[in-house]
Amino acid sequence: MATLEQRLTDLLEAPVVALGFELWGIEFIRAGNHSTLRVFIDGENGVTVENCAEVSHQVGAIMDVEDPITEEYFLEVSSPGLDRPLFKVAQFEKYVGQEAAVQLRMATNNRRKFKGVIKAVQGDMITLTVDGKDDVLAFTNIQKANIVPNFG
């Protein structure tokens, strides 16, 4: 069974692409009585506040009609930012050579949190170099991953 995020991606990807943007990823966060649907978009020339408003209007209309989330929630549309989350294997491939912070669902080598350079991607296996040692992580075991911005 597909996750809520996957069902929402399937529902929203084509309309976002039709507006000229890439649907970078989706997060649905429940925190007490408040839930937030975060839709991350990216564009060839970046993303402006006006772009986010345009996509938010379209996504909001689709969500109102399709009603895939029964509870109340806030809709946020934004660019992924410098510390962009990584949702897809292809996004890891795009950032080979960059540093990433990765949190796993289940421990690998007695660890759930890794911070290292994305060395390689083969199939759904991600190789991170952490302190000079390679750790191979299954994409399906990754709970959350973000690029670590380099300001140096």
Curated annotation (Swiss-Prot):
Keywords: Cytoplasm, Ribosome biogenesis. One of its GO terms (biological process) is translation. One of its GO terms (cellular component) is cytosol. It comes from the Bacteria. Gene3D superfamilies: Ribosome maturation factor RimP, C-terminal domain (2.30.30.180), RimP-like superfamily, N-terminal (3.30.300.70). InterPro entries: Ribosome_maturation_RimP, RimP_C, RimP_C_sf, RimP_N, RimP_N_sf. It is found in: Cytoplasm. The keyword Glycoprotein does not apply. Its main location: cytoplasm. NCBIfam families: PRK00092.1-1, PRK14640.1. Belongs to the RimP family. Required for maturation of 30S ribosomal subunits. This is Ribosome maturation factor RimP.
